[in-house]
Amino acid sequence: NQLNIQAPDLAGNTGPVAVVVKNAAGESAAYSATASKELPGLFTYSLAGKTYPAAVRLDAVVVGPPNVPGVVPAKPGEMILFFGTGFGPTNPAVTPGKVFSGAAPLVDSVTMRIGGVSVTPAFAGLSSSGLNQFNVTIPDLANGEHAVEMSINSVSIPSGVVIAVQR
């Protein structure tokens, strides 16, 4: 079972919180969860034992390893859009309970490295409800698979994500 929610702004409060689910059938018992300002993660997919970012080129073609139908490797100098969630507050803030549309930059800066090279996203923020987007130019890297590392306020995404690059 899975429940996807938009958590309300807890005004900086972090730590244990009680979650109660209410619907037409009634209400659940309280579940304990941990609130944090950010718990970042990229959306990913697994293929042949490797984890790739759910990323696209500007023409919406999915980025992935070579020789896989329907996907293409990233190229050095190319702008790639990465997607994730949990990267924290934006400015302007998102109104709780309202559907968001538009673009809102993150309040705090994201640190990102691809293949060990620091990159600065041209945009890092919310692009729709619950969806963070990062527009990043791929650095000058050799052909191959390169680690993707990201963090915000010293909280890192899970390790093991690689992006395929081919000149």
Predicted regions and their residues:
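A sequence-level detector for low-complexity, Ser/Thr- and acidic-rich stretches
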Residues: 1-167
